[in-house]
Amino acid sequence: MTNHPKMTALAVEFFARFARFEHALKEIPEFRNGDEDGVKPNWDVFGQAAEIAALYSAIVAAPKAQYLVQNPPRKRIVRSGILEWKDMPKPQNTMEVLVAIRRVRNNLFHGDKGNPNLSRNVQLFEACIAILDMALAANNDVLLAYEINQDIS
């Protein structure tokens, strides 16, 4: 993926932590959607939980976390048949911050992080990790599922 050791380590750390976080959400009945065909984390319900919704002011005040709010990840689009990046508005609440974190994950997973040596990517990964940590600290049920059940086989 890259020759930049810090970028590689952060990308792997973010991706692994994001995966564990989604797994933890699925362990909590109120934070999952699913049936016999599959299960998905319900990020919207999680983001609406009072303790999570209240995190926005802490996110914008935290030096590492605020980078995501001030410099939101761009969205990959096709305009007139040409693949482009679309600038996205700054998140105005925790729900929108969670969408931005998922966009960073999608851009990474689908290979759209571009030049991996850009300090912007490093800062986005650091911000996402910081915010996920804040969300874990705010919800004991998700934290417990995150810490105890690490088997995501």
Predicted regions and their residues:
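Charge-enriched, short contiguous segments at helix-coil
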Residues: 92-103, 107-138
